[in-house]
Amino acid sequence: MSTQKLWGGRFTETGAKYVDDFGASISFDQLLAAEDIAGSLAHVKMLKKTGILPAADVDQIVAGLETLAERQKQGELEFSTVNEDIHMNIESLLTEEIGPVAGKLHTARSRNDQVATDFHLYLKHQLPLILDRLHELETVLVDKASENVETVMPGYTHLQHAQPISYAHYLLAYYQMFKRDMERFEFNLKHTDISPLGAAALAGTTFPIDREYSAKLLGFSEVYHNSLDAVSDRDFVLEFLSNASILMMHLSRFCEEIVSWSSYEFKYISLSDQFSTGSSIMPQKKNPDMAELIRGKSGRVYGNLMGLLTVMKGIPLAYNKDLQEDKEGAFDTVTTVLTSLHVFTGMLATLTVNEDRMADATTNDFSNATELADYLANKGIPFREAHAIVGKLVLDGLKKQRPLQDIPLKEYQSISPLIQEDVYHDLNAKVAVERRHSLGGTGFDQIRQELQRAQTQLSAYQSETTD
């Protein structure tokens, strides 16, 4: 491989090796090798179509690039920091493959639009993989919710028992979060599906190129309509990192509850041994390490977002070398998101729900206090007065260790003769859940309707991606 830099004509001195190493990005942007070759193939075919390059030259370049593409698939390409980045490494390898005619490939193109094209292609390929993983997670959520429609558990506010809910209702809350994540990534894909190829360095080119043609060859839906914007834009990457951060936040919240609920104090759920680890010193331990790791990995994704935001905030138009720092965080985030989703989905699919423990937790926790207040309000007592009455009953019950459903009817009627035997029906946790049939509520009928809606949405995605 040549040690002569492809841009070296203007220079009389060579840089020191440590300077070359500092400026080189090939250690990480080699991940874009397939996209770089694909972009070059589309570009040179466009040069042939427009008559900018002779057909014979183009055919030779195409053959060389196709050879490199095959070698890349086999992992046979060797790169050098002397050639800095993936673009110049590929061109150098092409020169070795076909000779000086390879130098014509860069006609009407700059590394500025080249790297932007590579990055667009990379995320364009990765986003559907993330969407598929999210769809798999949503499917498991819906399946698990379908199995637990009538599994009653405490609902929490401030991590205090608040009102009884269905475990399925809890799971479907996360389904809605992940559904919004999917919608954000789908919108992100639209912003990624735009070709910057042909913008050249920043001002376009004097050659009669056909940008729409090269965009079509690469599968892009449209092209950038401002060459400065085309080479300067990293909004699509920031949007991806932002969406990924929100997704990881959702996973982290879920993992926090998995960690807590699998503890001895809660015992609401039990994790499969496949997704747990032990202790090197304490034989009894079964640690929720995978949930903790996913929770922890949210921080590195946040860091990747803040890193690129900080890089971008001070960059004038158009390209600046700072933009070399846009890739490692994005690459890391793609890997982190894909692996986190894969592990989390398996963990959720295999966890066991302790229905009896969840139900027991609603028995003596006074989470039916709102039911009693509503009962009194329905009997004509103003809600604020009912709220105060029930608050005093709860305080008394805490002192006597007596839940609301154990208060004798005679004692209730001393508060109001309107209270009848049916009050005990309303104080039952399962009944309390079932009666919350307002739209979006935790009532069993509402949950079944939401499950049906979710299954329709999942089927629609499946149909769209298989057509």
From Swiss-Prot:
* Any one Gene Ontology molecular-function term assigned to this protein's record: argininosuccinate lyase activity
State its location(s). Cytoplasm
- Which EC number(s) does UniProt give? 4.3.2.1
The record's catalysed reaction(s) read:
2-(N(omega)-L-arginino)succinate = fumarate + L-arginine
Q: Name one GO cellular component term.
A: cytosol
Pfam families in alphabetical order:
ASL_C2, Lyase_1
The identity of this protein, by name, is Argininosuccinate lyase
Write down the species: Lactiplantibacillus plantarum (strain ATCC BAA-793 / NCIMB 8826 / WCFS1) (Lactobacillus plantarum)
